[in-house]
Amino acid sequence: MNRSILKFVKNGIISSSSRINNNGFINKNNNNRWFATLPQPNRGIAGEKQPIYLDMQSTTPIDPRVLDAMLPLYTENYGNPHSKTHAYGWTSNDLVEDAREKVSKIIGADSKEIIFTSGATESGNIAIKGVARFYKEKKNHIITTVTEHKCILDSCRHLEMEGFKVTYLPVGENGLVDLELLKNTITPQTSLVTIMAVNNEIGVVQPIKEIGKICRENGVFFHTDAAQAVGKIPIDVNDMNIDLLSISGHKIYGPKGVGALFVRRRPRVRIEPITTGGGQERGIRSGTVPSTLAVGLGAACDIALKEMNHDAAWVKYLYDRLLKGITDNIPNVKVNGDLNARYYGNLNISFSYVEGESLLMAIKDVACSSGSACTSSSLEPSYVLRSLGVEEDMAHSSIRFGIGRFTTEQEIDYTIEILKKNVQRLRDMSPLWEMVQEGIDIKTIEWSQI
């Protein structure tokens, strides 16, 4: 494949160049692996000040190799993949099918089981609403957990308004679902269980294989929101007995606006479409497939599959470095979620006696989050953390750091230093912290209500 890489220049024009390392795109390491070298925090692509990016659960930067794969579809192979009467359509269709094959390989599926969508939100809506409505005459019960992504919870709530019964399973303090409780909750009326693979807020990895086994033994379809899992942890839909699986492009260094839904063919999962039209994508998702975005998703999956072990080792190394740097230098902190059953690109940690939003503003040179980007406009404490039993003040003090493929040691070290400085500064302003330093147990204080 041509390794030419796109370079952003100051006037906004995109030009093709090869093996660039001046202000930001290509370096080659000792392992013959190509990396995009992202701009340092004191300069952006066009030279402006840019913060360090540690919000990988919100979105990831597009891998330059993905961008490279997409460019020809903007300039040469721009045909509609559904046009069957000329070469433009044939070429575009071939590229889309090649991308479909690459997406299928990363989860061990058949390419015919991959449906292109606009993202994981649409995939989740199709899976949950589509299965529930198709089988509603026979079964009307769905099971999920209280810590799912908003798109899953809202889909279930909409089904409740249509007359379906939904059970929202609690999770333990570690964020994991109780398998015995799941098993005992399934009834003859249960059509679908939907439990996410990796939680977007706390990084906890659910026991997907065990959940799939329970569902298969009980004749219940199993959907998992794998937006935060695909390309990060190994997934095999057959070994794990997964029937439906949601994928997001921009969570794996691919483009925004594209995703995929795996729909099992044997045993066949039937879906009532929620979008009608031209009958594309096996009639499940009508609408012209955005061939450029689909190819980008395919390229992202191909890279992620080949480099998953390397990425995982790098992310774990940086996670350990960040966690040690925080815990060695800042007292009274707590990691949220299970310490072992987790994806190490996600560190959600609470800083006692510090308001999370205040800390985010104080460390503005680091782009991170106090929770899901989908709910970040709300000042309410995270519903995921509250579901774990985290006290409200600790939930308010949580920060999520997202580590990824292109994160550097220098960025982690800078983050540790800026946290040390600003957590202490904010605590010094807190009368509660002063009382704790004096040995007062503030939980025993009866505060007057005025």
Swiss-Prot record:
Protein name as catalogued: Probable cysteine desulfurase, mitochondrial
Active site: C374
Transit peptide: 1-52
Main subcellular location: mitochondrion
EC number(s) reported in the record: 2.8.1.7
Compartments in which it is found: Mitochondrion; Nucleus
GO biological process entries: [2Fe-2S] cluster assembly; iron-sulfur cluster assembly
UniProt source species: Dictyostelium discoideum (Social amoeba)
A molecular function GO annotation: metal ion binding
A Gene Ontology term for the protein's cellular component: nucleus
Matches recorded under PROSITE patterns: AA_TRANSFER_CLASS_5
Keywords: Iron, Iron-sulfur, Metal-binding, Mitochondrion, Nucleus, Pyridoxal phosphate, Transferase, Transit peptide
Family per record: Belongs to the class-V pyridoxal-phosphate-dependent aminotransferase family. NifS/IscS subfamily.
Claim: RNA-binding is one of the keywords in the record: no
Cofactor(s) listed: pyridoxal 5'-phosphate
Residue sites binding pyridoxal 5'-phosphate per the record: A120, T121, N200, Q228, S248, G249, H250, T288
Residues found modified as N6-(pyridoxal phosphate)lysine: K251
Lineage: Eukaryota, Amoebozoa, Evosea, Eumycetozoa, Dictyostelia
Binding-site positions, [2Fe-2S] cluster: C374
Disulfide bond sites: none
Pfam families per the UniProt record, alphabetical: Aminotran_5
Known role: Catalyzes the removal of elemental sulfur from cysteine to produce alanine. It supplies the inorganic sulfur for iron-sulfur (Fe-S) clusters.
Known catalytic reactions: (sulfur carrier)-H + L-cysteine = (sulfur carrier)-SH + L-alanine
This protein's encoding gene: nfs1
Coiled coil: none
